[in-house]
Amino acid sequence: MGTDSRAAGALLARASTLHLQTGNLLNWGRLRKKCPSTHSEELRDCIQKTLNEWSSQISPDLVREFPDVLECTMSHAVEKINPDEREEMKVSAKLFIVGSNSSSSTRSAVDMACSVLGVAQLDSVIMASPPIEDGVNLSLEHLQPYWEELENLVQSKKIVAIGTSDLDKTQLEQLYQWAQVKPNSNQVNLASCCVMPPDLTAFAKQFDIQLLTHNDPKELLSEASFQEALQESIPDIEAQDWVPLWLLRYSVIVKSRGIIKSKGYILQAKRRGS
């Protein structure tokens, strides 16, 4: 892997942006870890294997070009939705903002997901709570810039429905009253509450908000874990220079049968100072 790693390291030393996409994990076959114990473990494994695959297939032309934006893809697993089957599929995504960057990440994540899957719009996007400093309670002000961008995407028909994650009754009520496009769902982590809070259930029922459950950790991808995965896959690199900005996890479900046809991750990272 030495030569591959050196070529990948040289490209990453010059580029400013990294786009990583796993393709459809159901197409990975034996590459995929059979039973990842957590979502974080699955994600880290996916990042490393995608980096390994990409670095092993770098062409001499790419090294000569030194592109500013690197497209790191598990090429054999890429799978676009057949336009003839689009109406039969539900395309859902959950967006995790990782870096302390602007809300424009929301648009770039949705645009990239549509491009990767070959669709004009996503049926549903749930926004994980944005990162905040330790000891600070999540407020409406934290959510507003991201929600406004999601609203713009609904109005421009890039998304059909938008939802939230891990909001309590007060937070959900504040967002609902302020928002132009109302949340149609709110995910609740059952690790933190075995039973749905009655006040949240009552509010959601009153305003027709679907309550869903999830088991994502509070921090699915940290800056440190991304840099460790990068360093392990490509030793010839200053991994600490790279910061993940956002992560999007998508799933494509056959509506009539409830079967997952495709699922994967898309990620964007930036090099500091670039």
Swiss-Prot record:
<dbReference type="GO" id="GO:0044344">
    <property type="term" value="P:cellular response to fibroblast growth factor stimulus"/>
</dbReference>
<dbReference type="GO" id="GO:0009410">
    <property type="term" value="P:response to xenobiotic stimulus"/>
</dbReference>
<dbReference type="Pfam" id="PF00248">
    <property type="entry name" value="Aldo_ket_red"/>
</dbReference>
<dbReference type="GO" id="GO:0044877">
    <property type="term" value="F:protein-containing complex binding"/>
</dbReference>
<protein>
    <recommendedName>
        <fullName>Glutamate--cysteine ligase regulatory subunit</fullName>
    </recommendedName>
</protein>
<comment type="similarity">
    <text>Belongs to the aldo/keto reductase family. Glutamate--cysteine ligase light chain subfamily.</text>
</comment>
<dbReference type="GO" id="GO:0006536">
    <property type="term" value="P:glutamate metabolic process"/>
</dbReference>
<dbReference type="GO" id="GO:0007584">
    <property type="term" value="P:response to nutrient"/>
</dbReference>
<feature type="modified residue" description="N6-acetyllysine">
    <location>
        <position position="263"/>
    </location>
</feature>
<dbReference type="InterPro" id="IPR036812">
    <property type="entry name" value="NADP_OxRdtase_dom_sf"/>
</dbReference>
<keyword id="KW-0317">Glutathione biosynthesis</keyword>
<keyword id="KW-0597">Phosphoprotein</keyword>
<dbReference type="GO" id="GO:0071372">
    <property type="term" value="P:cellular response to follicle-stimulating hormone stimulus"/>
</dbReference>
<dbReference type="GO" id="GO:0006750">
    <property type="term" value="P:glutathione biosynthetic process"/>
</dbReference>
<dbReference type="GO" id="GO:0006749">
    <property type="term" value="P:glutathione metabolic process"/>
</dbReference>
<dbReference type="GO" id="GO:0097746">
    <property type="term" value="P:blood vessel diameter maintenance"/>
</dbReference>
<dbReference type="InterPro" id="IPR032963">
    <property type="entry name" value="Gclm"/>
</dbReference>
<dbReference type="GO" id="GO:0051409">
    <property type="term" value="P:response to nitrosative stress"/>
</dbReference>
<dbReference type="GO" id="GO:0004357">
    <property type="term" value="F:glutamate-cysteine ligase activity"/>
</dbReference>
<dbReference type="GO" id="GO:1990830">
    <property type="term" value="P:cellular response to leukemia inhibitory factor"/>
</dbReference>
<dbReference type="GO" id="GO:2001237">
    <property type="term" value="P:negative regulation of extrinsic apoptotic signaling pathway"/>
</dbReference>
<dbReference type="InterPro" id="IPR023210">
    <property type="entry name" value="NADP_OxRdtase_dom"/>
</dbReference>
<dbReference type="GO" id="GO:0008637">
    <property type="term" value="P:apoptotic mitochondrial changes"/>
</dbReference>
<dbReference type="GO" id="GO:0097069">
    <property type="term" value="P:cellular response to thyroxine stimulus"/>
</dbReference>
<comment type="pathway">
    <text>Sulfur metabolism; glutathione biosynthesis; glutathione from L-cysteine and L-glutamate: step 1/2.</text>
</comment>
<dbReference type="GO" id="GO:0035733">
    <property type="term" value="P:hepatic stellate cell activation"/>
</dbReference>
<dbReference type="GO" id="GO:0017109">
    <property type="term" value="C:glutamate-cysteine ligase complex"/>
</dbReference>
<keyword id="KW-0007">Acetylation</keyword>
<dbReference type="GO" id="GO:0006979">
    <property type="term" value="P:response to oxidative stress"/>
</dbReference>
<dbReference type="GO" id="GO:0044752">
    <property type="term" value="P:response to human chorionic gonadotropin"/>
</dbReference>
<dbReference type="GO" id="GO:0014823">
    <property type="term" value="P:response to activity"/>
</dbReference>
<dbReference type="GO" id="GO:0006534">
    <property type="term" value="P:cysteine metabolic process"/>
</dbReference>
<dbReference type="GO" id="GO:0071333">
    <property type="term" value="P:cellular response to glucose stimulus"/>
</dbReference>
<dbReference type="GO" id="GO:0043524">
    <property type="term" value="P:negative regulation of neuron apoptotic process"/>
</dbReference>
<feature type="modified residue" description="Phosphoserine">
    <location>
        <position position="59"/>
    </location>
</feature>
<comment type="subunit">
    <text>Heterodimer of a catalytic heavy chain and a regulatory light chain.</text>
</comment>
<dbReference type="GO" id="GO:0051900">
    <property type="term" value="P:regulation of mitochondrial depolarization"/>
</dbReference>
<dbReference type="GO" id="GO:0035729">
    <property type="term" value="P:cellular response to hepatocyte growth factor stimulus"/>
</dbReference>
<dbReference type="GO" id="GO:0035226">
    <property type="term" value="F:glutamate-cysteine ligase catalytic subunit binding"/>
</dbReference>
